[in-house]
């Protein structure tokens, strides 16, 4: 997805997690699942649902993750998409934010993946549009302002 962005649409970004091998500058990076609490802290993905995924990646705004955070999660069972999406939405909507307040949350389903993106409305909308363009079978499960 990030490679499809025009230069004028890009922002300072990084991907990955706390493991140096997974950290990427200006690109998405792998997120390890061995520590569910890290997945929750980095991506606002509920710890209890980490057992339902077998791979994850992230892309975040380098200056402030609340400006843009995206997580892509491969579900072990695609039938869990609806319940995991609901859990993600509930978690994000009830989070106590620091250092900026994100405008919008989108949770989408693409094949066996769940994609969560929150942050500045313009950045989130751009990502949503590029996701739908790249993957026409994308289903927007929820699209909500964060209040």
Roles of regions detected by a PLM:
Residues 1-69, 75-147:
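Soluble, non-membrane globular domain cores that form compact, hydrophobic packing
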């Amino acid at each position: 997805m990030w490679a499809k962005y025009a230069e004028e649409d890009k922002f300072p970004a990084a991907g990955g997690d706390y493991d140096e091998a997974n950290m990427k500058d200006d690109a998405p990076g792998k997120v390890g699942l061995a520590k569910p609490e890290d997945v929750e802290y980095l991506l606002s993905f509920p710890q209890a649902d980490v057992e339902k995924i077998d791979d994850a990646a992230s892309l975040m705004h380098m200056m402030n993750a609340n400006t843009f955070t995206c997580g892509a999660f491969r579900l072990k069972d695609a039938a869990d998409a609806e319940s995991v999406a609901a859990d993600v939405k509930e978690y994000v909507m009830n989070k106590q934010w620091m250092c900026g307040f994100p405008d919008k949350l989108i949770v989408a389903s693409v094949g066996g993946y769940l994609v969560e993106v929150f942050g500045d409305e313009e950045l989130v909308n751009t990502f949503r549009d590029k996701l739908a363009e790249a993957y026409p079978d994308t289903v927007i499960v929820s699209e909500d302002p964060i209040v």
